[in-house]
Structures are given as structure tokens and as C-alpha cells.
């Protein structure tokens, strides 16, 4: 399974979806999985159920999409967004327009209709973040009550929490 994930990420890198740093983040996560035994424990199972409940109860859920998500599971993330009526928003730590367009193209190819995060006129700044992830869409993460943020870094989680949002994060390993 690990080799398949690695191949999908390398393919995603070659297609312009994944940043070099995204390859490293995946490798770092895999190292922890190997050390911890790659099992979903009882606490994690409870967290998954709680996250699912939060998503079903959300009034304005948004799924933040990065290159790793677009490379590894675009079909599944689009399906999830439709099932829970969540908006999809491209929000990147290492951002450039070419990469955003490649991610949007991949999501659309997998059934997404509307994808936020590429219209500069809709951009707002989320206070408390120094990286490019501070730029969010006024109709997406900025107004969301629940935000799904795969491969999360702590500063954005803290900023989203301070903005009154419920944050759901998970590791793609």
C-alpha cells in the first residue's frame, strides 16, 4: 500500500499537483506509522465517528484541498463533498497559479462542479497565519463552520479555531 501511495504522489508531482514538500510530508507521516504500527486504535475510531457527526451537523462545511489530496484521492474527496454538501476550496501552503489550476482540473475531472480558492476577488485573509494558507475564499473557509484540513499544520488549526470554526484533520497515511 505504501508503495502505491508513493507512486501516486510522484505521479501527482510530475503532473504539477504536489509540491516537493508534500512528498516529504507524506514520508514523515509514514515514518510515524511504521513506528506506531499503522493501526487505527479505539481513540482514533471514536474521533472518526465524532468527525463524521460534525460534518453531518455542519451548516457550512468546507473541505480544504491540497496537492496531496488531489493526487491521492480526488474521486473520494469529491464524493465526500457531495454527500455532506461541503464546498471544496484549494488552499495551499506552497502556492502558485499553475499548481492551483492543475488541482482544480483534477477535481473537475473527478466530478467536482464548483471549486473555490482561485478567484482573487473572493480572497480574504485569515488572521494568525503567516503562510499562503492565510488567503481563503470569502464564500468558503472564511465563512465555514466546519473545515476539513488534511495534512494539517498547527498554526492554521489555531487560527481557524480562534475564528470559531470546528477543525477536522487527518493523516493521509
Q: Language-model segments: which ranges?
A:
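Alpha-helix C-terminal capping/helix-to-coil transition sites in glycosyltransferase folds
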Residues: 57, 142-143
Amino acid at each position: 500500500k505504501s508503495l502505491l501511495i508513493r507512486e501516486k504522489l510522484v505521479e501527482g508531482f510530475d503532473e504539477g499537483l504536489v509540491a516537493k514538500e508534500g512528498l516529504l510530508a507524506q514520508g514523515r507521516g509514514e515514518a510515524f506509522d511504521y513506528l506506531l504500527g499503522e493501526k487505527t486504535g479505539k481513540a482514533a475510531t471514536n474521533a472518526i465517528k465524532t468527525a463524521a457527526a460534525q460534518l453531518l451537523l455542519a451548516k457550512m462545511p468546507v473541505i480544504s484541498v491540497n496537492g496531496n489530496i488531489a493526487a491521492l484521492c480526488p474521486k473520494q474527496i469529491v464524493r465526500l463533498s457531495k454527500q455532506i454538501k461541503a464546498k471544496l476550496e484549494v488552499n495551499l501552503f506552497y502556492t502558485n497559479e499553475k499548481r492551483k489550476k492543475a488541482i482544480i482540473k483534477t477535481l473537475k475531472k473527478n466530478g467536482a462542479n464548483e471549486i473555490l480558492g482561485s478567484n482573487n476577488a473572493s480572497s480574504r485573509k485569515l488572521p494568525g497565519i503567516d503562510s499562503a494558507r492565510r488567503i481563503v475564499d470569502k464564500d468558503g473557509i472564511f465563512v465555514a463552520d466546519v473545515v476539513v484540513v488534511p495534512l494539517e499544520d498547527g498554526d492554521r488549526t489555531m487560527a481557524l479555531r480562534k475564528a470559531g470554526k470546528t477543525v477536522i484533520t487527518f493523516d493521509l497515511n
